[in-house]
Amino acid sequence: MSFHLKQVTRRFGKHTAVDSVDVEIPQGQMVGVIGRSGAGKSTLLRMINRLVDPSSGSIHFNDTEVSSLKGAALRAWQRDCAMIFQQFNLVPRLDVLTNVMLGRLNHRSTALSLFNIFSHEERLMAIAALERLGIEHVAMQAAGTLSGGQQQRVAIARALMQSPKMVLADEPIASLDPLNAKIVMDALRDINEREGITVITNLHTLDTARNYCERIIGMSQGRVVFDGTPAELTAAAVTEIYGTDSQGSGIDETMTSTSINIPGAQLAARPVQQSAGPEPLALAGL
């Protein structure tokens, strides 16, 4: 299975946000898309998910032309192509468990979706997704009461509930501290490695792309100017992606670092402190 962007362009008025991008991604790759703000990274992901339509070119997944889908077929694609946003896109007043179960809506009948009636099996799936991300203890809290890192993990759990073939993550760690950034990136890599799901993530930070992605795509002014492995991302390639400063010097990579690796800290293994109270399964009525 493969995914192919064929000469995809997106214009907003006279501005070309994405310019003639032609990229093929085999199933199961973890791809980082890097570049300055305004390089076209978010627009590219939104076109893949069909939140935005291309002005020209076409998008293909296996034998399906994604860019021409409409109605139920388009909804099915957006179910199969889960998207995670920088601002989480949760419903703040709903509890975490319900937010996660909303990922099943496109798998269900219209009547059940309308009344948000979830099955026992779906509740178990949601709890399992939260447990996988280490946040099952907040299952019955309102999503709006969580920290940014916790909310992003809820968003990832919701994406898992879609049973996707591809996960798109649009700047998933841009607003997070280094600890939570590492937890989120570890979760995305785990999804990629354990399920073999294609993950495409937009990143501002070179160190994160190098550490987590087997393939890096660099964008500048809407065009792909680099496509290769982390080892191939040389200083010259970085300069082509990010340009130079006002004095004409190459970009300082410390400016594009999250300091995501904290020496001596076992961040991924650090246990989450659970609050006292009933177990999440009991709270969920399971």
From Swiss-Prot:
InterPro entries: AAA+_ATPase (IPR003593), ABC_transporter-like_ATP-bd (IPR003439), ABC_transporter-like_CS (IPR017871), ABC_transpr_PhnC (IPR012693), MetN_ABC_transporter-like (IPR050086), P-loop_NTPase (IPR027417). Its main location: membrane. It comes from the Bacteria. The keyword Magnesium does not apply. It catalyses: phosphonate(out) + ATP + H2O = phosphonate(in) + ADP + phosphate + H(+). Residues 3-246 form the ABC transporter domain. It is an enzyme of class 7 (translocase). ATP binds at G35, R36, S37, G38, A39, G40, K41, S42. Its EC number is 7.3.2.2. The keyword Transferase does not apply. One of its GO terms (cellular component) is plasma membrane. One of its GO terms (molecular function) is ABC-type phosphonate transporter activity. Keywords: ATP-binding, Cell inner membrane, Cell membrane, Membrane, Nucleotide-binding, Phosphonate transport, Translocase, Transport. It is a peripheral membrane protein. Belongs to the ABC transporter superfamily. Phosphonates importer (TC 3.A.1.9.1) family. Part of the ABC transporter complex PhnCDE involved in phosphonates import. Responsible for energy coupling to the transport system. The complex is composed of two ATP-binding proteins (PhnC), two transmembrane proteins (PhnE) and a solute-binding protein (PhnD). This is Phosphonates import ATP-binding protein PhnC. It comes from Agrobacterium fabrum (strain C58 / ATCC 33970) (Agrobacterium tumefaciens (strain C58)). The gene is phnC.
